[in-house]
A protein has these predicted regions:
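ABC ATPase "signature
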Residues: 130-131
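Conserved ABC ATPase "signature" region
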Residues: 1, 8-43
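Helical segment within the ABC ATPase nucleotide-binding domain
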Residues: 86-98
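A short, surface-exposed alpha-helical micro-motif characterized by mixed small hydrophobic
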Residues: 112-114
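Conserved catalytic motifs of ABC-family nucleotide-binding domains
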Residues: 68
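Catalytic Walker B motif of ABC-type/P-loop ATPase nucleotide-binding domains
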Residues: 72-76
Length: 151
């Protein structure tokens, strides 16, 4: 019974997921490791709804890392962050990219230009350019759509 955590060999979460105590310990260790990878190990026992927004971004990435992906898809990881947190996120993405492939969907062009080595630029659902950062940043279609005509 899920509510009977004192007499069972598994806790509420592990019981609901059908995990043994050993599996629960392994899963917790993977979660701790993922939090360490995003420099958030100190928040492991805190409620997610009590964390500042930039830290919740780290927790979201850590949740994805628990599954030990070969490809990590990050959807606007810098969205809603201030300049200092964006700088930190750039560093984190660089670090993660040494451990797995990263696909980044992002509108902050400074983030894109600093962390990507190959770009596919879409405008209204159409690929308007692809290639390395230098080539794409000079493409007139990209400049007009995203970087501004004055660049």
């Amino acid at each position: 019974m899920i509510g009977d955590t004192k007499s069972s060999k598994s806790g509420l979460i592990s019981g609901a997921l059908g995990l043994s105590k050993n599996d629960e310990v392994k899963l917790r260790q993977r979660a701790i490791t993922a939090l360490e990878r995003v420099y958030a190990s100190g928040i492991a026992d805190q409620r997610a709804d009590s964390l500042p927004y930039p830290v919740t971004k780290r927790v979201a990435i850590a949740r994805a890392l628990v599954s030990e992906p070969k490809i990590l898809l990050l959807d606007e990881p810098a969205g809603g962050l201030g300049a200092q947190d964006i700088e930190w996120m750039n560093s984190l993405i660089h670090n993660l990219a040494t451990q797995c492939s990263v696909i980044l969907v992002e509108h902050h062009m400074d983030v894109v230009m600093s962390v990507c080595n190959r770009l596919y630029v879409l405008n209204f659902g159409e690929v308007i350019s692809s290639g390395d950062v230098e080539k794409v940043s000079r493409d007139p279609a990209v400049v007009e759509a995203y970087l501004g005509v004055n660049n």
